[in-house]
């Protein structure tokens, strides 16, 4: 005989409160990997734009698994990563209250796409940003060198200011994304010199990450607007004959205390939350100028990573890209922060070398039949539109 349960686990986690929209669209890096002076100087993060998803076929190399040495099909995410431009360096001093910035040194010339980041309305502005700062370089570089020496003398953490080249992507936005990226490896002086040498120069994705590396993806999830308690918290639907709605919380608390507790599931905003996704594996780092960046040893067809017709609602990937295992936060066109992992990975899954056998490049708009335009033309023959 069935009976009522008087105790049950609560619905939804309280660890993600407040469930409100993120303050900014770019993912914030709240912790960087631990520095190791024995390694060469390198960046610990990179910015990219989510282009879309596809799927791949590969042989699983995992002894003991039932799928060992057998083909598996996996979903992958393509993130376009044009080279980033270094435009500044920031020095941080360790204090009893944590890290505090000592000074910031900017490059002499900044492109228009990064200057737009400092204006709400670029069209109506006077566009005077960094004009006085550029005069320091014109008059004398002594003050610039003095600030760099202060960073070498007093700082323990060095981070560079780098921005994306958003004009190279299919996005309509003209305002580049700017962020601080920690520089690890070598001494503090080596880091400052590395930053100074790379002022106004580009840094590509291959100098930061490598294939088969486990990384973290930081971004803002897809926004879903206002949702009720059932969709937002996963509460149970009430019985069919319930008065005034089923997808609600029947009891929102006791008479006293005479207010609704913060732990009670309520309707409100869902999605557009800042999230950090750990342990995404890099399956491939492709070059934008390679006509065979989607070919493999088993599939020698000359094809690019962009599917036929382009990625839906994104377009054509013409720059360097990163192929990550599984899904990532956010919709297409969302800027994502790729960060080196904070952990030392020892699991077989993390250390497994990945060798791709086939990458799907069929159209993602509907059920794609062909992998390349040449394959479609060979099958369909000469069409009427080709003759006219």
UniProtKB/Swiss-Prot annotation:
Instruction: List cellular component terms (GO).
Output: cytosol; cytosolic large ribosomal subunit; preribosome
Q: Does DNA-binding count among this protein's keywords?
A: no
Listed Basic residues bias regions: 18-31
Q: Which PROSITE patterns does the protein's record reference?
A: RIBOSOMAL_L3 (PS00474)
Biological role: Component of the ribosome, a large ribonucleoprotein complex responsible for the synthesis of proteins in the cell. The small ribosomal subunit (SSU) binds messenger RNAs (mRNAs) and translates the encoded message by selecting cognate aminoacyl-transfer RNA (tRNA) molecules. The large subunit (LSU) contains the ribosomal catalytic site termed the peptidyl transferase center (PTC), which catalyzes the formation of peptide bonds, thereby polymerizing the amino acids delivered by tRNAs into a polypeptide chain.
Q: Where in the cell is it found?
A: Cytoplasm
The UniProt entry's GO biological process terms, in alphabetical order, are: cytoplasmic translation; translation
Keyword terms of this UniProt record: Cytoplasm, Ribonucleoprotein, Ribosomal protein
Query: Pfam families under this entry?
Result: Ribosomal_L3
Q: What is this protein called?
A: Large ribosomal subunit protein uL3B
Q: Name one GO molecular function term.
A: RNA binding
Similarity-based family? Belongs to the universal ribosomal protein uL3 family.
UniProt feature, compositional bias: Basic and acidic residues: 1-10
Q: Does the keyword Cytoplasm apply?
A: yes
Q: Where is this region: Disordered?
A: 1-34
Quote the record's miscellaneous comment: There are 2 genes for uL3 in S.pombe.
Q: Which InterPro entries match?
A: L3_arc_euk, Ribosomal_L3_dom_3_arc_sf, Ribosomal_uL3, Ribosomal_uL3_CS, Transl_B-barrel_sf
How this chain assembles, per its entry, is:
Component of the large ribosomal subunit (LSU). Mature yeast ribosomes consist of a small (40S) and a large (60S) subunit. The 40S small subunit contains 1 molecule of ribosomal RNA (18S rRNA) and at least 33 different proteins. The large 60S subunit contains 3 rRNA molecules (25S, 5.8S and 5S rRNA) and at least 46 different proteins. uL3 forms together with ES39L one of the contact sites for the signal recognition particle that targets ribosomes to the endoplasmic reticulum membrane.
């Amino acid at each position: 005989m069935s009976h009522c349960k008087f105790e049950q686990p609560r619905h939804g986690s309280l660890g993600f409160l407040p469930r409100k929209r993120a303050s900014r669209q770019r993912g914030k890096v709240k912790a960087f990997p631990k520095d190791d002076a024995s390694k060469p100087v390198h960046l610990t993060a990179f910015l990219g734009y989510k282009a879309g998803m596809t799927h791949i076929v590969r042989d699983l190399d995992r002894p003991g698994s039932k799928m060992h040495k057998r083909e598996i099909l996996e979903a992958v995410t393509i993130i376009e990563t044009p080279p980033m431009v270094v435009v500044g360096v920031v020095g941080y001093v360790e204090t009893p209250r944590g890290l505090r910035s000592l000074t910031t040194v900017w490059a002499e010339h900044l492109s228009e796409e990064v200057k737009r980041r400092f204006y709400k309305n670029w069209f109506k502005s006077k566009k005077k940003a960094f004009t006085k700062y550029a005069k320091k370089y014109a008059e004398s570089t002594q003050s610039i060198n003095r600030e760099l020496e202060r960073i070498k003398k007093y700082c323990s953490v060095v981070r560079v200011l780098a921005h994306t080249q958003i004009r190279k992507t299919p996005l309509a936005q003209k305002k580049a994304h700017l962020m601080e990226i920690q520089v690890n490896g070598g001494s503090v002086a080596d880091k400052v010199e590395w930053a100074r040498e790379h002022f106004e120069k580009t840094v590509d994705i291959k100098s930061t990450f490598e294939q088969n590396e486990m990384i973290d993806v930081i971004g803002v999830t897809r926004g879903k607007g206002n949702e009720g308690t059932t969709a937002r918290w996963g509460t149970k639907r009430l019985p069919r004959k319930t008065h005034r709605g089923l997808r609600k919380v029947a009891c929102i608390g006791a008479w006293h205390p005479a207010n609704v507790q913060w732990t009670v599931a309520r309707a409100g905003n869902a999605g557009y939350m800042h999230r950090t996704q750990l342990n995404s594996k890099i399956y491939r780092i492709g070059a934008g100028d390679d006509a065979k960046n989607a070919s493999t040893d088993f599939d020698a067809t000359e094809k690019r990573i962009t599917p036929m017709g382009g990625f839906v609602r994104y377009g054509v990937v013409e720059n360097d890209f990163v192929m990550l295992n599984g899904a990532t936060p956010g919709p297409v066109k969302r800027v994502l922060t790729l960060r080196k992992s904070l952990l030392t990975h020892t699991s077989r899954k993390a250390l497994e070398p990945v060798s791709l056998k086939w990458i799907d490049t069929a159209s993602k708009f509907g059920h794609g039949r062909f992998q390349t335009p040449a394959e479609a033309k060979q099958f369909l023959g000469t069409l009427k539109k080709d003759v006219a």
